[in-house]
């Protein structure tokens, strides 16, 4: 796949620092060395293996793979790709993996009408999870972060309360907001 654009995930930063993931459901494959970072990208198929029937040269795809996308070209198994919907800009398509993860998390957390939800971190995924929580009927969505810009964005996107954990104790604040019940 010829890369169009790639994102830098928090896990990429951890891997770069030498922290490898545990063998869990998310990370089924042990890393192979040399270990190339990157798993958030989108691009165009430039070659296919003889047993591949799902994709052809020229198809635009989003990568949902384990690693190796920090390159102009990368190799992927067919199951680690998803076709880009017709008309979707490739700059947006490259965000397919983190968007899908955040949407899945946000929509499958068991949030119910009237719940209070605390989202720890106002990054890309946290913003999406906060919005999904509101859509699922959460009464109160609280976003905690240390960066004012992320907190301001969360507030503008519908968070009810934002907490800067550099300035306030989030546990004490959540308890105060919920009459000691918590979230």
Locate the predicted segments by residue.
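Glycine-rich beta-strand-centered segment in the early N-terminal region that forms part
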Residues: 1-7, 21-67, 85
């Amino acid at each position: 796949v010829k890369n169009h654009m790639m994102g830098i995930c928090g896990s990429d930063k951890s891997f770069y620092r030498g922290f490898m993931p545990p063998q869990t459901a998310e990370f089924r494959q042990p890393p192979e060395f040399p270990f190339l970072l990157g798993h958030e990208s989108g691009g165009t198929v430039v070659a296919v293996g003889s047993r591949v029937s799902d994709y052809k040269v020229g198809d635009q795809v989003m990568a949902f793979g384990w690693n190796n996308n920090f390159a102009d070209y990368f190799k992927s198994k067919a199951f680690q790709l998803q076709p880009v919907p017709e008309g979707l800009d490739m700059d947006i398509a490259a965000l397919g993996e983190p968007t899908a993860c955040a949407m899945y998390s946000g929509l499958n957390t068991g949030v119910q009408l009237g719940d209070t939800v605390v989202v720890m971190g106002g990054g890309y995924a946290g913003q999406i999870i906060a919005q999904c929580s509101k859509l699922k009927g959460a009464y109160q969505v609280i976003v905690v972060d240390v960066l004012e810009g992320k907190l301001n964005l969360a507030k503008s996107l519908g968070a009810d309360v934002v907490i800067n954990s550099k300035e306030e104790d989030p546990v004490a604040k959540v308890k105060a907001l919920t009459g000691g019940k918590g979230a």
